[in-house]
Amino acid sequence: MYLELHFQFLFRFFSLIPIPCTIPNFRYHTRLLISRNXVFMNKLKMALLVVFLVSLFACTTIHQPKETVKSRFLKNNRLNKISIINIYTT
């Protein structure tokens, strides 16, 4: 019952928002409007490509690969050996 009311509310809410047609209808357009629409679509594609590449670069630089357990163990083992050597030499 609650889910039905929830979906009805969402359906009514989103039906109030007009959704523009994304497929251009060129039947009633002049050549100027057709070329402007084609240029706008090309600019939109380029902008989306740039956003995709920037976000991909940001994701790869933010999340550096984690140090493996083996490398951590070897590093800790080396540090322990060095500290043991320092203890015995002093």
Swiss-Prot record:
Protein name per Swiss-Prot or TrEMBL: Uncharacterized protein HI_1037.1
Q: Which GO terms describe its cellular component?
A: membrane
| Membrane-protein topology | Single-pass membrane protein
Which residues are listed as membrane-spanning? 46-62
- Provide the protein's localization: Membrane
Species name: Haemophilus influenzae (strain ATCC 51907 / DSM 11121 / KW20 / Rd)
Provide the alphabetized UniProt keywords. Answer: Membrane, Transmembrane, Transmembrane helix
Q: Does the keyword Transmembrane apply?
A: yes
